Amino acid sequence: MTTRTEAVKAYLLDLQDRICAALETEDGGARFIEDAWTRPAGGGGRTRVIGDGAVIEKGGVNFSHVFGSGLPPSASAHRPELAGRGFEALGVSLVIHPHNPHVPTSHANVRFFIAEKEGEEPVWWFGGGFDLTPYYGNIDDCVHWHRVAERACAPFGADVYPRYKAWCDSYFHIKHRNEPRGIGGLFFDDLNEWDFDTSFAFMRAIGDAYIEAYLPIVQRRKAAAYTAQQREFQEFRRGRYVEFNLVYDRGTLFGLQSGGRTESILMSLPPQVRWGYDWKAEPGSEEARLTEYFLQDRDWLAASN
């Protein structure tokens, strides 16, 4: 493991600790359970799960560090020159599914890949981002989420937030439904256009921004009253989350194709979901407004003006 990889690993382990501590404090009841694991083909990780809390119905904050002699197809398909290289992949990935339909589901991920081949320069890149999936939309929450994202990106250039915001909107799109998974945030991958130190600093800025972006929303919404009908709608919308993760998500595909730990990879799935045949929201309802207004590619910073 190189000095660079050691620095990334130390940051990611600390990030996992800090996020878990903040979420436990906010929940006020449940605690994370850690499951340390090793990967027979090389590497391992720390899976931390939380559930049946006062706020969090199910969540996980995972750290993994895996390595192998060749990249799986999901990682090399869009960069065929990497085929046959040994690799190391480190990351923290998290998903939080709250009980209350008024509290959005959140997802965040930061990761580092390095691919090496004897006699050639190592190829490295960073990836990550965070995105929000509301069930009952709130403009203030969307604006806050994107404002934190913009602030995290600002030191790295005025074009960074709009570029990675647009990439997030494009990436988290459920093609067979022709709708976005949520209201977006940031997404970046294959990041090596800056030098290593700047790229690493950017990954840290995004990782550190997650709690600042999410917890104020949780605090505002966690005590809101909700009905059984609203809970059913939350479970219906969770079905879209499952569809995206199992069909399109690059991290899920990479994990399964590289012989990753199935329990950790599928940790992102919600605990209760429902599907209804050709279900449609009642016109003019809050449920209809979710798709008509909130689940659109929108400039949320402009919405605050």
UniProtKB/Swiss-Prot annotation:
GO CC annotations, alphabetized: cytoplasm
Active site: H107 (proton donor)
Enzyme class label: oxidoreductase
Pathway: Porphyrin-containing compound metabolism; protoporphyrin-IX biosynthesis; protoporphyrinogen-IX from coproporphyrinogen-III (O2 route): step 1/1
Pfam family name, one: Coprogen_oxidas
UniProt GO BP: protoporphyrinogen IX biosynthetic process
Keywords, sorted A to Z: Cytoplasm, Heme biosynthesis, Metal-binding, Oxidoreductase, Porphyrin biosynthesis
Sites marked Important for dimerization: H176
Residues annotated to bind substrate: S93, N109, V110, R111, G259, G260, R261
Subcellular localization(s) per the UniProt record: Cytoplasm
Stored InterPro entries: Coprogen_oxidase_aer (IPR001260), Coprogen_oxidase_aer_sf (IPR036406), Coprogen_oxidase_CS (IPR018375)
Reactions catalysed: coproporphyrinogen III + O2 + 2 H(+) = protoporphyrinogen IX + 2 CO2 + 2 H2O
Cofactor(s) essential for the protein: a divalent metal cation
Residue numbers binding a divalent metal cation: H97, H107, H146, H176
Similarity comment: Belongs to the aerobic coproporphyrinogen-III oxidase family.
Function summary: Involved in the heme biosynthesis. Catalyzes the aerobic oxidative decarboxylation of propionate groups of rings A and B of coproporphyrinogen-III to yield the vinyl groups in protoporphyrinogen-IX.
Protein name, UniProt field: Oxygen-dependent coproporphyrinogen-III oxidase
Phylogenetic placement of the source organism: Bacteria, Pseudomonadati, Pseudomonadota, Gammaproteobacteria, Pseudomonadales
